[in-house]
C-alpha cells in the first residue's frame, strides 16, 4: 500500500496490513543511551502518528502538543518527592496485579487471543520499565528552564500555524539535547495520508492531495512549495543546533539527523519509490 509506508520507514520491515512490524532504529539507539539520560527516547508527531516501534513491532505513541512535551520533559510532577514516590509505588503495585492476572488468562486462551494478550503485556511491561526508570531518576533534579524559554515553549500552538508549530517542536528538541534530558527524538511531520495544508503560504490542500497531480503544472508548483516549506522548517532545526552549545561544543557537531519521506508522490508509475 503506497499510503502505508510510514510505519516501516525506520524499521525496514515489510509493509502491509497483515505484515508484522519490527523495531525502529531510533529505539535501538535509545537503548544504548538509556543509562545516561532521564528519557531514552521521545516520539513526536503532528497528527499523533508515530515513527517509533518497539522490539515487538508495536507503535510507541507520539506526543503532538508542545505544552505536553514541555511538561513531560521539564516539569516536575506536583506534590513533591514523597508524593511522587507514593504514586510510583502505587503504579508498580497495579502493574504487578495486572501482569499476574494476565498470566492466568494466558493459560486459558487460544493462539490468536494469546497474540493479542502478548501485545497488551508488552505495553504493560513498557510502563513498568518507565516506572522503574522514574524511580531511579526521582532524586535527580530536572534542568532549570528560564522564564523566557518557558513562555516560548510551554504553550499551545494551533496546527493551522504550521511554521510556528514545527519551529516550537524543533526548539523543544534542541532544548532537550542541550540539557541532555534525552538524546533521541523522532518527529513525524505528516504521513502520506495526513500531511497538513499550509494556510500561511496559501496552500489549502494537503500534501497527499497535491501528490495526486497527474502532471498538472499548477499542482506540481504547489507540491514544490509545500516541500520547500517543510525543508525550510527542518533547516531551522539545523540552524538552531548550530547556534546552541553544550559542554562539548555546538550541538550540531554531536548530533546525527535523518530527514526524508517514504513516498515522493502517488503518481509514480511503479512501486519503486525513493527513500
Report the location of each language-model feature.
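A long, amphipathic alpha-helix that forms part
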Residues: 103-107, 115, 212-253
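Extended, H/D-rich, highly charged conserved domains that either
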Residues: 117-197
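Single conserved hydrophobic/aromatic residue that forms the stacking wall/gate
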Residues: 264-275
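Structural recognition of the beta-strand scaffold that forms the well-ordered cores
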Residues: 40-44, 183-188, 209, 257-260
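Flexible loop/turn segments at secondary-structure boundaries
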Residues: 49-51, 192-197, 267
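Surface-exposed acidic, glycine-flexible loop patches that form ligand/cofactor-binding
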Residues: 32-35, 176-178, 243-252
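A contiguous, mid-domain pocket- or channel-lining segment that forms the substrate-recognition surface
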Residues: 2-142
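Contiguous alpha-helical scaffold segments within structured protein domains
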Residues: 188-227
Amino acid at each position: 500500500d503506497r499510503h502505508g509506508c510510514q510505519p516501516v520507514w525506520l524499521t525496514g520491515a515489510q509493509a502491509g496490513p497483515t505484515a508484522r512490524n519490527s523495531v525502529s532504529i531510533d529505539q535501538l539507539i535509545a537503548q544504548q543511551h538509556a543509562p545516561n539520560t532521564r528519557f531514552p527516547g521521545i516520539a513526536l508527531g503532528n497528527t499523533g502518528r508515530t515513527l517509533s516501534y518497539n522490539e515487538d513491532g508495536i507503535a510507541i505513541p507520539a506526543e503532538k502538543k508542545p505544552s505536553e512535551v514541555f511538561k513531560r520533559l521539564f516539569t516536575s510532577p506536583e506534590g513533591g518527592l514523597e508524593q511522587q514516590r507514593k504514586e510510583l509505588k502505587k503504579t508498580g503495585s497495579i502493574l504487578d496485579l495486572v501482569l499476574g492476572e494476565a498470566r492466568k488468562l494466558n493459560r486459558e486462551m487460544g493462539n490468536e487471543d494469546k497474540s493479542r494478550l502478548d501485545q497488551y503485556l508488552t505495553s504493560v511491561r513498557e510502563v513498568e520499565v518507565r516506572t522503574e526508570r522514574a524511580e531511579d531518576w526521582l532524586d535527580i533534579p530536572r534542568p532549570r528552564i528560564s522564564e523566557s524559554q518557558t513562555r516560548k515553549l510551554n504553550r499551545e500552538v494551533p496546527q493551522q500555524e504550521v511554521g510556528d508549530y514545527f519551529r516550537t517542536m524543533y526548539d523543544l528538541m534542541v532544548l532537550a539535547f542541550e540539557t541532555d534530558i534525552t538524546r533521541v527524538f523522532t518527529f513525524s511531520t505528516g504521513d502520506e495520508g495526513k500531511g497538513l495544508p499550509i494556510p500561511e503560504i496559501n496552500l489549502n490542500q494537503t500534501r497527499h492531495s497535491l501528490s495526486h497531480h497527474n502532471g498538472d503544472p499548477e499542482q506540481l508548483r504547489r507540491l514544490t512549495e509545500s516541500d520547500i516549506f517543510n525543508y525550510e522548517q527542518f533547516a531551522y532545526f539545523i540552524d538552531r543546533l548550530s547556534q546552541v552549545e553544550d559542554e562539548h561544543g555546538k550541538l550540531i557537531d554531536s548530533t546525527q539527523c535523518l530527514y526524508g519521506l517514504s513516498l515522493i508522490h502517488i503518481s509514480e508509475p511503479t512501486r519503486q519509490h525513493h527513500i
